[in-house]
């Protein structure tokens, strides 16, 4: 799951589609947000679909009862491994995106009610409040996930999955901010 999550799809699509190295433009982040800003949404859409379906959902499904039957704990670990791979890619000197789309895919495979909460907080926030920055709303959703998982009485593995994702998100935010140089390149 980590290796699949590590595939730097936004970087590759930026290079192939328009010859742009997104590590050297915009935020310097090699995620779909920077790809959208630098190359355009028509190129970012397939990347988001890949990140959701292949990096997030596929490892969870493979670990699930539908394929290998390894149990909810291994499914959750596979989802987190995909996100960690996306955030700290072995193919990109351990730089990566923020993992939000990969997390959507992992959560889709793990638990639909948790996915609805994770996805609806940013949607409601952006659509119905004056604060239009989806990153803020995704961060709020990440913080709320463990609380909702516990309130919904989900299996303890999903509560820990939510806690792990919150910690991975916090770690990515802190390391991204500390690694930026003055040129805006990570």
Name each region found by the language model.
Residues 10-13, 83-95, 122-131, 170-180:
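C-terminal ends of transmembrane helices
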Residues 115-120, 133-141, 153-166:
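Loop-to-transmembrane alpha-helix initiation sites
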Residues 20-31, 91-104, 131-141:
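Short, non-helical or kinked segments that cap or interrupt transmembrane helices
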Residues 12-44, 96, 178-186:
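Cytosolic, membrane-interface loops and tails of multi-pass inner-membrane proteins
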Residues 56-77, 108-114, 149-160:
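Helix-coil boundary and interhelical linker segments in multi-pass alpha-helical membrane proteins
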Residues 36-40, 63, 100-130, 143-152:
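Interfacial segments of multi-pass membrane proteins
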Residues 37-64:
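Multi-pass membrane catalytic core of lipid/isoprenoid biosynthesis enzymes
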């Amino acid at each position: 799951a980590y290796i699949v999550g590590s595939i730097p799809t936004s970087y590759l699509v930026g290079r192939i589609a328009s010859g742009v190295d997104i590590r050297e433009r915009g935020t310097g982040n090699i995620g779909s947000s920077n790809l959208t800003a630098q190359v355009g949404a028509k190129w970012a859409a397939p990347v988001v679909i890949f990140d959701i379906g292949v990096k997030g959902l596929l490892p969870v499904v493979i670990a699930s009862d539908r394929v290998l039957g390894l149990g909810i704990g291994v499914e959750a670990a596979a989802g987190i491994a995909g996100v960690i791979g996306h955030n700290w890619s072995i193919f990109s000197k351990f730089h990566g995106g923020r993992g939000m789309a990969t997390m959507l895919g992992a959560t889709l495979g793990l638990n639909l009610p948790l996915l609805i909460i994770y996805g609806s907080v940013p949607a409601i926030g952006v659509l119905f409040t004056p604060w239009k920055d989806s990153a803020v709303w995704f961060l709020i959703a990440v913080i709320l996930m463990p609380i909702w998982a516990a309130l919904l009485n989900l299996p303890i593995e999903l509560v820990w999955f939510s806690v792990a994702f919150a910690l991975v998100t916090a770690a990515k935010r802190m390391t991204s901010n500390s690694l930026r140089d003055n040129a805006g390149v990570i």
